[in-house]
Design a protein with these regions (language model features):
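Amphipathic alpha-helical coiled-coil segments
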Residues: 41-55, 123, 127-148, 157, ...
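Membrane-embedded beta-strands of outer-membrane beta-barrel proteins
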Residues: 90, 296-298
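Short, charged, amphipathic alpha-helical segments
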Residues: 106-110, 173-182, 315, 382-390
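Bacterial N-terminal signal peptides
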Residues: 6-17
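Small/polar (Gly/Ser/Thr/Ala-rich) solvent-exposed segments
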Residues: 42, 64-83, 95-122, 248, ...
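Periplasmic alpha-helical coiled-coil/stalk elements that build and connect Gram-negative outer-membrane
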Residues: 123-243, 342-345, 349, 392, ...
Length: 424
Protein backbone atom coordinates (compact mmCIF):
# COMPACT_ATOMS: atom_id res chain seq x y z
CA UNK A 1 0.00 0.00 0.00
CA UNK A 2 2.80 2.37 0.91
CA UNK A 3 4.63 1.47 -2.34
CA UNK A 4 1.51 2.28 -4.41
CA UNK A 5 1.15 5.66 -2.71
CA UNK A 6 4.84 6.43 -3.27
CA UNK A 7 4.65 5.48 -6.96
CA UNK A 8 1.52 7.59 -7.42
CA UNK A 9 3.18 10.60 -5.80
CA UNK A 10 6.30 10.16 -7.93
CA UNK A 11 4.25 9.97 -11.14
CA UNK A 12 2.30 13.08 -10.16
CA UNK A 13 5.51 14.98 -9.46
CA UNK A 14 6.96 13.86 -12.78
CA UNK A 15 3.86 14.95 -14.70
CA UNK A 16 3.83 18.28 -12.87
CA UNK A 17 7.45 18.82 -13.89
CA UNK A 18 7.14 17.70 -17.52
CA UNK A 19 3.77 19.09 -18.57
CA UNK A 20 4.68 22.81 -18.55
CA UNK A 21 7.70 22.13 -20.77
CA UNK A 22 5.48 20.23 -23.22
CA UNK A 23 2.77 22.89 -23.37
CA UNK A 24 1.95 24.14 -26.85
CA UNK A 25 3.39 27.48 -27.84
CA UNK A 26 1.06 30.47 -27.99
CA UNK A 27 0.21 32.36 -31.15
CA UNK A 28 2.04 35.49 -30.01
CA UNK A 29 5.19 33.48 -29.22
CA UNK A 30 5.11 31.98 -32.70
CA UNK A 31 4.59 35.34 -34.40
CA UNK A 32 7.42 37.03 -32.52
CA UNK A 33 9.78 34.13 -33.15
CA UNK A 34 8.95 34.13 -36.86
CA UNK A 35 9.59 37.87 -37.14
CA UNK A 36 12.86 37.63 -35.22
CA UNK A 37 14.06 34.75 -37.42
CA UNK A 38 13.02 36.15 -40.83
CA UNK A 39 16.07 36.88 -42.98
CA UNK A 40 14.04 38.94 -45.45
CA UNK A 41 13.14 41.38 -42.68
CA UNK A 42 16.78 41.65 -41.66
CA UNK A 43 17.68 42.50 -45.26
CA UNK A 44 15.12 45.32 -45.30
CA UNK A 45 16.34 46.64 -41.95
CA UNK A 46 19.93 46.72 -43.19
CA UNK A 47 18.86 48.40 -46.42
CA UNK A 48 17.05 51.11 -44.46
CA UNK A 49 20.19 51.73 -42.38
CA UNK A 50 22.28 51.88 -45.56
CA UNK A 51 19.90 54.44 -47.06
CA UNK A 52 20.12 56.56 -43.91
CA UNK A 53 23.91 56.50 -44.17
CA UNK A 54 23.68 57.57 -47.81
CA UNK A 55 21.27 60.33 -46.82
CA UNK A 56 23.74 61.69 -44.27
CA UNK A 57 26.40 61.66 -46.98
CA UNK A 58 24.33 64.01 -49.16
CA UNK A 59 24.89 66.81 -46.64
CA UNK A 60 28.66 66.73 -47.08
CA UNK A 61 30.35 69.44 -49.13
CA UNK A 62 32.27 68.40 -52.25
CA UNK A 63 36.02 67.98 -51.91
CA UNK A 64 38.16 71.10 -52.38
CA UNK A 65 40.21 71.37 -55.58
CA UNK A 66 43.94 72.07 -55.26
CA UNK A 67 45.83 73.39 -58.29
CA UNK A 68 49.60 73.77 -58.75
CA UNK A 69 51.15 75.45 -61.78
CA UNK A 70 52.99 78.29 -63.47
CA UNK A 71 51.11 81.34 -64.74
CA UNK A 72 52.12 84.08 -67.18
CA UNK A 73 55.10 82.05 -68.42
CA UNK A 74 56.79 83.63 -71.52
CA UNK A 75 56.21 81.44 -74.54
CA UNK A 76 59.55 82.24 -76.22
CA UNK A 77 61.90 81.25 -73.41
CA UNK A 78 59.72 79.38 -70.93
CA UNK A 79 61.81 81.02 -68.19
CA UNK A 80 59.87 81.89 -65.06
CA UNK A 81 62.41 84.46 -63.75
CA UNK A 82 62.39 86.90 -66.69
CA UNK A 83 58.90 88.41 -66.66
CA UNK A 84 57.61 90.28 -63.59
CA UNK A 85 54.15 88.63 -63.76
CA UNK A 86 55.41 85.06 -64.01
CA UNK A 87 54.62 83.17 -60.82
CA UNK A 88 54.51 79.70 -59.32
CA UNK A 89 50.88 79.54 -58.23
CA UNK A 90 49.04 77.39 -55.69
CA UNK A 91 45.24 77.75 -55.80
CA UNK A 92 42.42 76.24 -53.77
CA UNK A 93 38.79 76.13 -54.86
CA UNK A 94 35.88 75.10 -52.59
CA UNK A 95 32.45 74.67 -54.17
CA UNK A 96 29.44 75.59 -52.03
CA UNK A 97 26.35 74.08 -53.68
CA UNK A 98 22.90 75.53 -53.06
CA UNK A 99 22.31 74.97 -49.34
CA UNK A 100 18.51 74.86 -49.48
CA UNK A 101 18.53 72.34 -52.31
CA UNK A 102 21.10 70.22 -50.48
CA UNK A 103 19.02 70.22 -47.27
CA UNK A 104 15.87 69.30 -49.20
CA UNK A 105 17.60 66.39 -50.92
CA UNK A 106 18.86 65.21 -47.53
CA UNK A 107 15.27 65.23 -46.23
CA UNK A 108 14.07 63.36 -49.33
CA UNK A 109 16.75 60.71 -48.85
CA UNK A 110 15.79 60.28 -45.20
CA UNK A 111 12.13 59.82 -46.17
CA UNK A 112 13.22 57.23 -48.72
CA UNK A 113 14.98 55.35 -45.93
CA UNK A 114 11.82 55.63 -43.83
CA UNK A 115 9.86 54.14 -46.72
CA UNK A 116 12.12 51.10 -46.64
CA UNK A 117 11.76 50.87 -42.86
CA UNK A 118 7.97 50.98 -43.15
CA UNK A 119 8.16 48.36 -45.90
CA UNK A 120 9.98 46.16 -43.40
CA UNK A 121 7.24 46.69 -40.80
CA UNK A 122 4.57 45.93 -43.40
CA UNK A 123 6.41 42.76 -44.41
CA UNK A 124 6.53 41.76 -40.73
CA UNK A 125 2.75 42.21 -40.46
CA UNK A 126 2.24 40.19 -43.64
CA UNK A 127 4.52 37.47 -42.28
CA UNK A 128 2.55 37.32 -39.04
CA UNK A 129 -0.73 37.19 -40.98
CA UNK A 130 0.55 34.36 -43.17
CA UNK A 131 1.70 32.44 -40.09
CA UNK A 132 -1.68 32.96 -38.43
CA UNK A 133 -3.38 31.53 -41.51
CA UNK A 134 -1.21 28.41 -41.21
CA UNK A 135 -1.93 28.10 -37.50
CA UNK A 136 -5.66 28.59 -38.09
CA UNK A 137 -5.60 25.92 -40.78
CA UNK A 138 -3.72 23.52 -38.50
CA UNK A 139 -5.97 24.15 -35.48
CA UNK A 140 -9.09 23.79 -37.63
CA UNK A 141 -7.79 20.53 -39.09
CA UNK A 142 -7.05 19.18 -35.63
CA UNK A 143 -10.53 20.09 -34.39
CA UNK A 144 -11.93 18.64 -37.60
CA UNK A 145 -10.21 15.36 -36.79
CA UNK A 146 -11.77 15.22 -33.32
CA UNK A 147 -15.16 16.13 -34.80
CA UNK A 148 -14.95 13.42 -37.44
CA UNK A 149 -14.18 10.93 -34.69
CA UNK A 150 -17.27 12.02 -32.73
CA UNK A 151 -19.39 11.92 -35.88
CA UNK A 152 -18.22 8.42 -36.66
CA UNK A 153 -19.20 7.40 -33.12
CA UNK A 154 -22.70 8.83 -33.69
CA UNK A 155 -23.06 6.87 -36.92
CA UNK A 156 -21.67 3.77 -35.20
CA UNK A 157 -24.53 4.02 -32.68
CA UNK A 158 -27.04 4.25 -35.49
CA UNK A 159 -25.38 1.37 -37.33
CA UNK A 160 -25.60 -0.81 -34.23
CA UNK A 161 -29.31 -0.05 -33.85
CA UNK A 162 -29.94 -0.59 -37.58
CA UNK A 163 -28.19 -3.95 -37.43
CA UNK A 164 -30.23 -4.97 -34.40
CA UNK A 165 -33.44 -3.90 -36.16
CA UNK A 166 -32.46 -5.87 -39.25
CA UNK A 167 -31.79 -9.00 -37.21
CA UNK A 168 -35.12 -8.53 -35.45
CA UNK A 169 -36.91 -8.25 -38.79
CA UNK A 170 -37.88 -4.58 -38.27
CA UNK A 171 -35.53 -3.12 -40.86
CA UNK A 172 -33.93 -3.75 -44.18
CA UNK A 173 -30.37 -4.55 -45.09
CA UNK A 174 -30.27 -1.33 -47.12
CA UNK A 175 -30.58 0.64 -43.87
CA UNK A 176 -27.42 -0.98 -42.52
CA UNK A 177 -25.63 -0.39 -45.82
CA UNK A 178 -26.63 3.28 -45.95
CA UNK A 179 -25.40 4.08 -42.47
CA UNK A 180 -22.20 2.10 -43.06
CA UNK A 181 -21.52 4.13 -46.20
CA UNK A 182 -22.04 7.35 -44.25
CA UNK A 183 -19.70 6.08 -41.56
CA UNK A 184 -17.09 5.05 -44.12
CA UNK A 185 -17.25 8.53 -45.64
CA UNK A 186 -16.23 9.93 -42.24
CA UNK A 187 -13.39 7.43 -42.00
CA UNK A 188 -12.13 8.46 -45.44
CA UNK A 189 -12.45 12.13 -44.51
CA UNK A 190 -10.44 11.41 -41.35
CA UNK A 191 -7.61 9.92 -43.40
CA UNK A 192 -7.55 12.94 -45.69
CA UNK A 193 -7.67 15.25 -42.70
CA UNK A 194 -4.72 13.48 -41.06
CA UNK A 195 -2.70 14.01 -44.24
CA UNK A 196 -3.64 17.70 -44.25
CA UNK A 197 -2.62 18.01 -40.58
CA UNK A 198 0.81 16.52 -41.32
CA UNK A 199 1.24 18.89 -44.27
CA UNK A 200 0.23 21.91 -42.17
CA UNK A 201 2.65 20.92 -39.40
CA UNK A 202 5.46 20.52 -41.92
CA UNK A 203 4.75 23.96 -43.41
CA UNK A 204 5.48 25.59 -40.04
CA UNK A 205 9.16 24.69 -40.45
CA UNK A 206 9.43 27.58 -42.90
CA UNK A 207 8.79 30.16 -40.17
CA UNK A 208 9.35 28.72 -36.70
CA UNK A 209 12.55 27.67 -34.93
CA UNK A 210 13.04 24.10 -33.79
CA UNK A 211 12.47 24.95 -30.12
CA UNK A 212 8.88 26.01 -30.78
CA UNK A 213 8.19 23.18 -33.20
CA UNK A 214 9.12 20.69 -30.48
CA UNK A 215 6.51 22.25 -28.18
CA UNK A 216 3.77 21.86 -30.76
CA UNK A 217 1.12 24.20 -32.13
CA UNK A 218 -2.14 25.13 -30.35
CA UNK A 219 -4.55 22.22 -30.77
CA UNK A 220 -7.74 24.25 -31.20
CA UNK A 221 -9.01 27.57 -32.45
CA UNK A 222 -9.94 28.48 -28.88
CA UNK A 223 -6.33 28.00 -27.78
CA UNK A 224 -5.17 30.03 -30.77
CA UNK A 225 -7.52 32.94 -30.02
CA UNK A 226 -8.48 32.64 -26.33
CA UNK A 227 -11.03 35.47 -26.48
CA UNK A 228 -13.27 36.58 -29.32
CA UNK A 229 -14.17 39.91 -27.77
CA UNK A 230 -15.87 42.72 -29.64
CA UNK A 231 -13.69 45.16 -31.55
CA UNK A 232 -13.88 48.96 -31.17
CA UNK A 233 -15.29 51.11 -33.97
CA UNK A 234 -13.05 52.49 -36.69
CA UNK A 235 -13.41 55.98 -35.20
CA UNK A 236 -11.98 54.70 -31.90
CA UNK A 237 -8.94 53.17 -33.64
CA UNK A 238 -8.43 55.91 -36.23
CA UNK A 239 -4.95 56.66 -34.89
CA UNK A 240 -3.97 53.01 -35.10
CA UNK A 241 -5.23 52.74 -38.67
CA UNK A 242 -3.29 55.88 -39.58
CA UNK A 243 -0.18 54.31 -38.01
CA UNK A 244 -0.46 51.18 -40.17
CA UNK A 245 2.85 50.53 -41.98
CA UNK A 246 1.09 50.62 -45.36
CA UNK A 247 -0.17 54.14 -44.58
CA UNK A 248 3.12 55.26 -43.05
CA UNK A 249 5.00 54.03 -46.11
CA UNK A 250 2.78 56.15 -48.36
CA UNK A 251 3.15 59.07 -45.95
CA UNK A 252 6.93 58.77 -46.25
CA UNK A 253 6.56 58.73 -50.04
CA UNK A 254 4.44 61.87 -49.87
CA UNK A 255 6.98 63.66 -47.66
CA UNK A 256 9.81 62.51 -49.92
CA UNK A 257 7.97 63.94 -52.93
CA UNK A 258 7.46 67.18 -50.98
CA UNK A 259 11.17 67.38 -50.21
CA UNK A 260 11.98 66.74 -53.87
CA UNK A 261 9.63 69.57 -54.78
CA UNK A 262 11.45 71.84 -52.31
CA UNK A 263 14.76 70.82 -53.88
CA UNK A 264 13.45 71.59 -57.38
CA UNK A 265 12.27 75.01 -56.19
CA UNK A 266 15.59 75.68 -54.46
CA UNK A 267 17.46 74.84 -57.68
CA UNK A 268 16.39 78.25 -59.00
CA UNK A 269 18.90 79.75 -56.57
CA UNK A 270 22.62 80.13 -57.33
CA UNK A 271 25.55 77.89 -56.42
CA UNK A 272 28.73 79.37 -55.00
CA UNK A 273 32.43 78.67 -55.00
CA UNK A 274 35.28 80.29 -53.06
CA UNK A 275 38.74 80.61 -54.68
CA UNK A 276 42.11 81.33 -53.06
CA UNK A 277 45.41 81.53 -54.93
CA UNK A 278 48.98 82.27 -53.87
CA UNK A 279 51.58 83.11 -56.53
CA UNK A 280 55.30 82.96 -55.69
CA UNK A 281 57.79 84.90 -57.83
CA UNK A 282 61.54 84.28 -58.14
CA UNK A 283 63.59 86.29 -55.66
CA UNK A 284 66.77 85.79 -57.72
CA UNK A 285 65.37 87.34 -60.88
CA UNK A 286 67.58 89.89 -62.69
CA UNK A 287 64.65 92.23 -62.39
CA UNK A 288 65.12 92.37 -58.64
CA UNK A 289 63.05 91.21 -55.73
CA UNK A 290 59.34 91.01 -56.48
CA UNK A 291 56.53 90.48 -53.98
CA UNK A 292 54.39 87.36 -54.09
CA UNK A 293 50.77 87.71 -55.18
CA UNK A 294 47.62 86.63 -53.32
CA UNK A 295 44.20 86.26 -54.99
CA UNK A 296 40.76 85.58 -53.51
CA UNK A 297 37.31 85.54 -55.07
CA UNK A 298 33.77 84.19 -55.04
CA UNK A 299 32.16 82.50 -58.03
CA UNK A 300 28.38 82.60 -58.38
CA UNK A 301 26.70 80.15 -60.76
CA UNK A 302 23.54 81.83 -62.08
CA UNK A 303 20.79 79.46 -63.33
CA UNK A 304 19.80 81.62 -66.30
CA UNK A 305 19.71 79.31 -69.32
CA UNK A 306 18.36 76.24 -67.52
CA UNK A 307 15.29 77.88 -66.06
CA UNK A 308 12.88 76.16 -68.44
CA UNK A 309 14.33 72.77 -67.56
CA UNK A 310 14.14 73.62 -63.87
CA UNK A 311 10.55 74.79 -64.23
CA UNK A 312 9.58 71.49 -65.83
CA UNK A 313 11.33 69.62 -63.02
CA UNK A 314 9.45 71.64 -60.43
CA UNK A 315 6.11 70.98 -62.14
CA UNK A 316 6.86 67.24 -62.25
CA UNK A 317 7.82 67.24 -58.56
CA UNK A 318 4.59 69.04 -57.62
CA UNK A 319 2.53 66.50 -59.59
CA UNK A 320 4.30 63.61 -57.87
CA UNK A 321 3.67 65.17 -54.47
CA UNK A 322 -0.04 65.58 -55.22
CA UNK A 323 -0.23 61.99 -56.47
CA UNK A 324 1.42 60.65 -53.32
CA UNK A 325 -0.96 62.69 -51.16
CA UNK A 326 -3.96 61.26 -53.04
CA UNK A 327 -2.59 57.73 -52.66
CA UNK A 328 -2.24 58.26 -48.90
CA UNK A 329 -5.82 59.52 -48.55
CA UNK A 330 -7.11 56.59 -50.60
CA UNK A 331 -5.13 54.08 -48.50
CA UNK A 332 -6.54 55.51 -45.26
CA UNK A 333 -10.08 55.27 -46.61
CA UNK A 334 -9.44 51.70 -47.76
CA UNK A 335 -8.07 50.72 -44.34
CA UNK A 336 -11.10 52.20 -42.60
CA UNK A 337 -13.56 50.51 -44.98
CA UNK A 338 -11.80 47.16 -44.68
CA UNK A 339 -11.74 47.46 -40.90
CA UNK A 340 -15.46 48.25 -40.72
CA UNK A 341 -16.26 45.34 -43.04
CA UNK A 342 -14.13 42.87 -41.09
CA UNK A 343 -15.46 44.11 -37.77
CA UNK A 344 -19.06 43.69 -38.97
CA UNK A 345 -18.30 40.18 -40.24
CA UNK A 346 -16.63 39.25 -36.94
CA UNK A 347 -19.66 40.46 -34.97
CA UNK A 348 -22.06 38.50 -37.16
CA UNK A 349 -19.91 35.39 -36.86
CA UNK A 350 -19.72 35.75 -33.08
CA UNK A 351 -23.49 36.15 -32.83
CA UNK A 352 -24.06 33.15 -35.09
CA UNK A 353 -21.59 31.06 -33.10
CA UNK A 354 -23.35 31.98 -29.86
CA UNK A 355 -26.66 30.95 -31.45
CA UNK A 356 -25.18 27.59 -32.42
CA UNK A 357 -23.78 26.97 -28.94
CA UNK A 358 -26.86 28.06 -26.98
CA UNK A 359 -29.71 26.97 -29.26
CA UNK A 360 -28.88 24.80 -32.26
CA UNK A 361 -26.42 22.45 -30.55
CA UNK A 362 -28.72 21.47 -27.66
CA UNK A 363 -31.67 21.17 -30.03
CA UNK A 364 -29.83 18.93 -32.50
CA UNK A 365 -28.42 16.74 -29.72
CA UNK A 366 -31.82 16.29 -28.05
CA UNK A 367 -33.43 15.53 -31.40
CA UNK A 368 -30.76 12.94 -32.16
CA UNK A 369 -30.98 11.24 -28.76
CA UNK A 370 -34.77 11.04 -28.93
CA UNK A 371 -34.72 9.82 -32.52
CA UNK A 372 -32.18 7.11 -31.69
CA UNK A 373 -34.24 5.99 -28.70
CA UNK A 374 -37.48 5.87 -30.74
CA UNK A 375 -35.72 4.01 -33.56
CA UNK A 376 -34.47 1.45 -31.04
CA UNK A 377 -38.05 1.09 -29.79
CA UNK A 378 -39.31 0.61 -33.34
CA UNK A 379 -41.56 3.70 -33.31
CA UNK A 380 -39.46 5.77 -35.75
CA UNK A 381 -38.43 4.77 -39.28
CA UNK A 382 -34.77 4.52 -40.18
CA UNK A 383 -34.76 7.42 -42.61
CA UNK A 384 -35.99 9.76 -39.87
CA UNK A 385 -33.30 8.53 -37.47
CA UNK A 386 -30.63 8.94 -40.16
CA UNK A 387 -31.90 12.46 -40.91
CA UNK A 388 -31.58 13.33 -37.20
CA UNK A 389 -28.01 12.00 -37.14
CA UNK A 390 -27.05 13.91 -40.28
CA UNK A 391 -28.67 17.08 -38.90
CA UNK A 392 -26.50 16.81 -35.79
CA UNK A 393 -23.39 16.21 -37.89
CA UNK A 394 -24.10 19.12 -40.22
CA UNK A 395 -24.73 21.40 -37.23
CA UNK A 396 -21.39 20.43 -35.72
CA UNK A 397 -19.55 20.93 -39.03
CA UNK A 398 -21.22 24.29 -39.67
CA UNK A 399 -20.29 25.52 -36.20
CA UNK A 400 -16.66 24.49 -36.67
CA UNK A 401 -16.53 26.24 -40.05
CA UNK A 402 -17.98 29.31 -38.37
CA UNK A 403 -15.26 29.21 -35.71
CA UNK A 404 -12.68 29.04 -38.48
CA UNK A 405 -14.20 32.06 -40.24
CA UNK A 406 -14.28 33.95 -36.95
CA UNK A 407 -10.61 33.21 -36.38
CA UNK A 408 -9.79 34.40 -39.90
CA UNK A 409 -11.68 37.64 -39.24
CA UNK A 410 -9.74 38.08 -36.00
CA UNK A 411 -6.49 37.57 -37.89
CA UNK A 412 -7.49 40.09 -40.57
CA UNK A 413 -8.38 42.67 -37.93
CA UNK A 414 -5.04 42.13 -36.21
CA UNK A 415 -3.33 42.86 -39.52
CA UNK A 416 -5.35 46.04 -40.06
CA UNK A 417 -4.80 47.35 -36.55
CA UNK A 418 -1.06 46.84 -36.92
CA UNK A 419 -0.56 45.81 -33.27
CA UNK A 420 -1.90 43.55 -30.55
CA UNK A 421 -5.27 44.05 -28.93
CA UNK A 422 -5.54 45.50 -25.44
CA UNK A 423 -7.31 42.36 -24.21
CA UNK A 424 -4.39 40.24 -25.35
Amino acid sequence: MFLRIALTAAMAATLATVSPAQAAFSRLEAERAAVADALALQVLSQEAEAQRAQARATRALPNPQLRLGLTNLPADTFAWDQEPMTQLQVSLRQALPNGRARAARFTAALEGARQTSEQRDLAALELRAALRERLIELAWRQEQGHLLGRQEAVLAQLESQALSAFKAGRGGESDVLEVRLARQARVQAQLQNDTAVASAEASLQRWLPEALLVQGAPASLTELFPTFTSWPTSAAVEDRLAAHPAARRLEAGWKMAGAQRDAAKADFGPDYAVDFAYGARDDLSPLGRRPDLLSAGITISLPLFGREKQAQGLAAAELREEGQRAALRDALRALKADYDSRRSAAKQQSDALTHYETTLFPLAERHWERSLARFAEGTLPFDRALAAALALLSTQSAALDLKRQRAQSESALLFLIGQELDHE
